Every structure is written in C-alpha cells, then in structure tokens.
C-alpha cells in the first residue's frame, strides 16, 4: 500500500473513480488498521481534498441510487414511520461526515449530531448467487461487499446502525407494529429510551 499511495500522490492526473477508491481505502485502513497505516498515512490536506472529491461524486441526494418504485415506497415508509418513533429529524439519503451515503439518518434537532443510521436492505444492497447448482428457494441473499464495508466503517467510527430488510418491512401489518419494530430495533442499536417516543 505504501508504494501505491506514494505513486498516486505523485501522479499528475487520476480518474475520478480512482480518487474515490483511494479515499475509501484510506477510510477503511484508518478505521481498521490504524497501527499499520500510521507509517504511511496520507497527508491531511490530501485526505481533505479526497473527501471533498468523494462527497461531490459519490454521496448525498445528487448521487443517490435510483430505486425501483416499490423499493422507494419502502424507504419512504420507513423514514415516515421513524418520525413517530424517535425525537429527532429524519433524513433520507443522508451523507455522513465521512462522505458515505446511508439510506436514512436520524439526527438530533438542535445539534444535528447523528442518533442512528437506518439501512434498508433490498435489491440495491443485496445479491443472490449466480451459481445454477445453488438452491434458489430459501437461499439467503448476501449483503454486497461495498455496503457491508460501509456499515463496518460507520460502526467503527461510533455510529449506531440499524438494518431492516424490505421483505421484513412489507410483512409488518399495520402502523403500530411498524413503530414497535423500529423502536425495538433502535433500542438494540443503542439509542436511549429517552430519545424514543
């Protein structure tokens, strides 16, 4: 990594995706291998520049992934229901300080600090095996590697993370059941009872 970082620092021009991936590598190494990464960590001004580039090209509402209509309804329903469950402001497609995008964020009203992130697993975050020999019926989907890494990084930075699948959300019958489920999910993620309605 040291040689790659030094080569990239000296390169006059790089592709946008390369810069975004370099920032993702930096964030992951800083979160999980700070002891080894410290020796050849990028300069702070380079990190700031990469973060700005990353936020511009990969995060927030301007770059939100387009969901299918039925999936979009689930995300909206989760966000709307959260407003009746927790004291705070609910944001869809929120961009974190690190530049990473999350499905739903609940922030404190006054300080705007994050209470919790809620991720909704569906076709945009899950994948199924393409192996024709694998059993398809009842075969569990897997979370995409990039989505899983993003969640690990955010948790490592101290953010509370709650995840719900679209299928589970659709199986909840009424509004009360959905609110109770979200309350329990947020409580398990570490949100204090005082913040829950």
Q: Where are the language model's segments positioned?
A:
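Eukaryotic RNA-binding helical-repeat scaffolds
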Residues: 1-197
């Amino acid at each position: 990594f040291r040689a790659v970082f030094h080569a990239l620092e000296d390169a006059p021009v790089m592709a946008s995706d390369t810069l975004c991936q370099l920032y993702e590598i930096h964030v992951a190494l800083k979160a999980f291998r700070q002891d080894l990464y410290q020796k050849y960590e990028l300069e702070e001004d380079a990190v700031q520049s990469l973060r700005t580039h990353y936020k511009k090209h990969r995060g927030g509402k301007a770059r939100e992934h387009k969901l299918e209509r039925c999936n979009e309804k689930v995300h909206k329903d989760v966000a709307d229901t959260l407003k009746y469950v927790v004291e705070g402001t609910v944001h869809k497609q929120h961009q974190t300080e690190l530049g990473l995008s999350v499905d739903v964020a609940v922030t404190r009203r006054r300080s705007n600090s994050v209470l919790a992130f809620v991720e909704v697993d569906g076709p945009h975050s899950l994948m199924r095996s393409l192996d024709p020999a694998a059993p398809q019926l009842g075969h569990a989907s897997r979370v995409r590697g990039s989505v899983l890494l993003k969640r690990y990084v955010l948790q490592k930075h101290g953010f509370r993370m709650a995840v719900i699948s679209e299928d589970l959300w659709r199986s909840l019958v009424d509004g009360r059941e959905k609110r109770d489920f979200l309350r329990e999910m947020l409580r398990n993620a570490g949100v204090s009872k005082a913040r829950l309605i």
